[in-house]
């Protein structure tokens, strides 16, 4: 029985720069070959005009209405970082950041690259802060670094996710104070804990030895921590029960591993797949092809297209696409007897450097899929394809149907 290889370029969608997009410019003979043999369309990850987060977009793409199942980004980050959340736990996504002398955020990612020894130093500092704050407020505080500037903070005890973010979500502003969003004592306590952790981190981080080295080399210091997306673990029907598919996900980013884990996918990583713009895809693609013999759907997440777009790096985004395509080239014959999906979870135009709400290109190839006349995978071409305009939540039912696993609706 055939299976599906699903390649997801995070933030891969774009707007034309000089009349062309990274997908259009990229030399990607394998993807374009299957485009010439498959059906194309454009995809609204959630719905037209909605600017998706990667979390809500992946929920929709995996077949779950984000308006029903989304409970905050933090829970998925924690799951993806290997934290087993308990009922009542509240988790936050964190960014290591840089603020100036007046406390204004000048870099929400502290230069993006955080070396392993720097991440370990931050974890030691956060463990000390967590122990002190935990004793003072009667909660347990867990922190774990994930990829680059990213991390996860988990609060355990009489806490609530009903608090506001400290992350201003843009540079040029001070770190926000967390505020309770309802009148509960749990929300009030949680906001106090979040603000105290934020304050203590900023006070202590300047003294970190790794910051002295960063400053000496001209790199921005890690002197602030930003929290956002407080949430709890939702109750989600596994994808095997809902869509009858055995699914696996390969991802280097904690958030995506967490969403996949939450919907019941088996989660894998591969050498070279660290969730950065410099990822090497050969081992990840090899693993994906091997897993196709054991799973109905194998999902491969490519983060670098989003990271480069957030940095405004057009050529870097093109390079990520081309490197992934090159990694596919040894497996063309293997893929040809199965199904292939290529798409994005949202657009991150290099000219905007943020997620936007336009549709993204979509390809479905398979031995029994109608062939249209598109021939080249890009925003400028896929709109002419046979599939028309789809929603993210349509993808998994469509794949289940092609695999012969979908149940009939009615008689």
Swiss-Prot record:
Q: Which Gene3D superfamilies match?
A: Alkaline Phosphatase, subunit A, Metalloenzyme domain
Cite the annotated pathway.
Carbohydrate degradation; glycolysis; pyruvate from D-glyceraldehyde 3-phosphate: step 3/5
Family named by the database record:
Belongs to the BPG-independent phosphoglycerate mutase family. A-PGAM subfamily.
- UniProt cross-references to Pfam families, sorted A to Z: Metalloenzyme, PhosphMutase
GO MF term set: metal ion binding; phosphoglycerate mutase activity
The membrane spanning regions, by residue number, are: none
Known InterPro entries for this protein?
Alkaline_phosphatase_core_sf, ApgAM_prokaryotes, Metalloenzyme, Pglycerate_mutase_ApgM, Pglycerate_mutase_ApgM_sf
Q: Can you state which reaction this protein catalyses?
A: (2R)-2-phosphoglycerate = (2R)-3-phosphoglycerate
The EC number(s) attached to this protein equal 5.4.2.12
What's the name of the protein? 2,3-bisphosphoglycerate-independent phosphoglycerate mutase
Q: Write out the function statement from the record.
A: Catalyzes the interconversion of 2-phosphoglycerate and 3-phosphoglycerate.
Which keywords are on file for this protein? Glycolysis, Isomerase
| Residues forming coiled coils | none
Please give the biological process terms from Gene Ontology that the record holds: glycolytic process
């Amino acid at each position: 029985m055939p299976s599906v290889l699903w390649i997801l370029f995070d933030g891969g969608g774009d707007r034309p720069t000089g009349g062309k997009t990274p997908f259009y410019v990229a030399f990607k003979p394998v993807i374009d070959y299957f485009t010439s043999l498959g059906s194309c369309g454009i995809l609204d990850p959630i719905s037209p005009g909605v600017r998706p987060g990667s979390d809500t977009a992946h929920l929709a793409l995996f077949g779950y209405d984000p308006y029903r199942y989304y409970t905050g980004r933090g829970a998925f980050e924690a799951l993806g970082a290997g934290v087993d959340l308990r009922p009542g736990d509240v988790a936050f996504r964190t960014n290591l950041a840089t603020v100036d002398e007046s406390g204004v955020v000048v870099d929400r990612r502290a230069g993006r690259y955080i070396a392993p020894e720097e991440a370990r130093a931050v974890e030691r500092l956060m463990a000390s802060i967590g122990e002190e704050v935990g004793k003072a407020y009667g909660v347990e505080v867990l922190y774990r670094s994930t990829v680059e500037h990213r991390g996860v903070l988990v609060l355990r005890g009489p806490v609530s996710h009903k608090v506001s973010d400290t992350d201003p979500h843009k540079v040029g502003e001070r770190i926000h104070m967390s505020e309770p969003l309802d009148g509960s004592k749990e929300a009030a306590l949680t906001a106090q804990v979040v603000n105290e952790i934020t304050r203590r981190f900023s006070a202590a981080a300047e003294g970190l030895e790794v910051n002295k080295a960063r400053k000496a080399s001209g790199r921005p210091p890690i002197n602030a921590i930003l929290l956002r997306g407080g949430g709890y673990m939702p109750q989600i029907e596994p994808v095997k029960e809902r869509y009858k598919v055995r699914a696996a996900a390969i991802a280097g980013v904690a958030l995506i591993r967490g969403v996949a884990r939450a919907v019941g996918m088996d989660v894998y990583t591969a050498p070279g797949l660290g969730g950065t713009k410099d990822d090497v895809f050969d081992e990840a693609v090899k693993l994906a092809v091997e897993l196709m013999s054991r799973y109905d759907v194998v999902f491969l997440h490519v983060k670098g297209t989003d990271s480069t777009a957030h940095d405004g790096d057009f050529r870097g985004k093109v390079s990520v696409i081309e490197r992934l395509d090159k990694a596919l080239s040894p497996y063309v014959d293997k893929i040809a007897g199965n199904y292939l999906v290529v798409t994005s979870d949202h657009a991150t135009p290099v000219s905007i450097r943020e997620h936007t709400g336009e549709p993204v290109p979509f390809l479905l190839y398979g031995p029994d899929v109608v062939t249209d006349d598109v021939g080249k995978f890009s925003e400028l071409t896929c709109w002419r394809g046979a599939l028309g305009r789809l929603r993210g939540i349509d993808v998994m039912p469509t794949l289940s149907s092609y695999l012969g696993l979908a149940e009939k609706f009615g008689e």
